[in-house]
């Protein structure tokens, strides 16, 4: 099956029929694929939000019951909240346990960003050299959403040639735009969690040491474990091996620049 942007797909299930048989909606893609003798890939973003639906468990069971019978449709389920996705797909008690292959997408490498961003600037008769693209990408830790946001801010500030000062000005401007959002989030952290975040920003390695616990008023070493878990569930931090990283590089930068200055 070769994609054809000029093709139109249509189906003949009426609204009244769907009201009588709502389950038909879940089989709609399969019915359409069979009728057109094609194969479809259905992509659903932020799928972890299914956990927030009313009677979520029953809904997930129904989804799986229908989808697992589809032979002409493949489902690609995306999400940005790793912890919530893992609960949906890797929890043995959940309906979507082992529903398919799990893939963790890595950050886009800087070398991949360089030609892409330079080309976009060239299309507008603007020039951004390799070093400036590298600076732009590394400032936001290769975070794809922020790379594109920062690139746009740099583009708007540039008449002809991008210089490092423009990138840094745009970077600080982006942090300023998000500062109110970050500020409001600080009210949701406990004092011990704030102390833990401050220790991370300060580069402390021995987070459970007596000196660190006292210096940052974190509490007990057992509290460190609970704080880590709570912050991971909130998608504030990520734990890869023994390394703790911030999920949001601009939140980390704001903490360093403004909150814990």
Residue ranges of each PLM-predicted region?
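Conserved nucleotide-binding/hydrolysis micro-motifs of P-loop NTPases
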Residues: 47-49, 80-84, 108-111, 154, ...
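Short, amphipathic alpha-helical interaction segments positioned at domain boundaries
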Residues: 250-261
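Accessory beta->alpha helical hairpin/"wing" motif in late/C-terminal subdomains of nucleic-acid enzymes
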Residues: 241-252
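Helix-loop-helix "sensor" segment of P-loop NTPases
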Residues: 87-138, 160-161
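Winged-helix-like regulatory helical subdomains adjacent to P-loop NTPase cores
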Residues: 138, 142, 148-219
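A short, conserved structural fragment
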Residues: 232-242
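Conserved Walker B catalytic segment
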Residues: 8-81, 90
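Short amphipathic alpha-helical interaction segments
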Residues: 216-234
């Amino acid at each position: 099956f070769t994609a054809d942007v000029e093709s139109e797909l249509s189906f003949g299930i009426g609204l009244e029929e769907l009201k009588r048989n709502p389950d038909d909606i879940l089989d709609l893609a399969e019915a359409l694929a069979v009728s057109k003798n094609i194969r479809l890939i259905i992509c659903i973003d932020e799928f972890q939000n299914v956990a927030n639906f009313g009677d979520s468990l029953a809904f997930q069971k129904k989804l799986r019951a229908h989808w697992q019978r589809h032979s002409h449709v493949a489902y690609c389920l995306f999400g940005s909240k790793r912890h919530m996705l893992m609960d949906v797909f890797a929890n043995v008690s959940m309906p979507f346990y082992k529903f398919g292959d799990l893939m963790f997408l890595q950050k886009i490498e800087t070398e991949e960003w360089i030609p892409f961003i330079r080309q976009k600037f060239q299309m507008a008769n603007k020039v951004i050299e390799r070093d400036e693209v590298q600076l732009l990408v590394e400032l936001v830790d290769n975070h794809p959403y922020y790379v594109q946001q920062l690139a746009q801010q740099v583009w708007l500030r540039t008449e002809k040639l991008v210089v490092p000062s423009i990138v840094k000005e745009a970077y600080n401007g982006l942090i300023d735009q998000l500062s109110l959002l970050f500020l409001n989030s600080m009210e949701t952290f406990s004092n011990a969690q704030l102390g833990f975040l401050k220790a991370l920003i300060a580069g402390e390695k021995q987070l459970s040491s007596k000196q660190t616990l006292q210096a940052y008023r974190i509490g007990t070493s057992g509290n460190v474990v609970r704080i880590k878990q709570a912050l991971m569930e909130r998608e504030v931090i990520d734990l890869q091996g023994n390394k703790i990283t911030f999920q949001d590089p601009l939140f980390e930068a704001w903490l360093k620049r403004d909150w814990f200055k």
